[in-house]
Amino acid sequence: MSIFIDLEMNTTDVRLVHKKDLRNEIIEIGAVRMDEAFHPLDRFRIFVRPQYNGVIERKIYKLTGISNGAVSDAVYLPEALDALEVWCGSDGCEIYAWSNSDLTQLRKECGFKGIDSALLDEMVQWHDFQEDFRQMLGEKNILSLSNAMHR
């Protein structure tokens, strides 16, 4: 079983947290569960209420379509991770994302906020699909997701 994960983030407010400590916060977790032939089986989507910037930055809204209203009544990150963990199940799976930046963000944000998630321990089987895809195509440089979609 494979799960592709994508995180969307908003910048933090410098008045509330030092940028060097936490530049961004997760505002959405999306995932798709796929079978061995990579056919979609199920989808997961949950909005996450940011703690360190109550306003979705304009550039983030334009990029993601995520509005202030979408996150204002959303759950906080611990509850979102619990929901993702339940959705993932306990059968074990390979986790894929377009780069390692989502895993880095998840670990950094959980560390900063003191969140202990069993799901993070299970994400040792994390795959950087951007790198896998680059190797499959024999490319020297990594591709943006947008460029990869046109291949």
What are the residue ranges of the model-derived segments?
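Single-residue recognition of alpha-helix boundary sites
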Residues: V17-K19, Y76, E139
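Entry/capping segment at the start of metal-dependent catalytic domains
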Residues: M1-A37
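Short, function-defining helix-loop hinge/capping sites that tune catalysis or transport
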Residues: V14-L16, D73, M136
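Metal-dependent phosphoesterase signature
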Residues: Y61-L81
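Metal-dependent phosphoesterase core characteristic of DEDDh/y 3'-5' exonuclease domains
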Residues: L22-I29, R33-T64, V86-R151
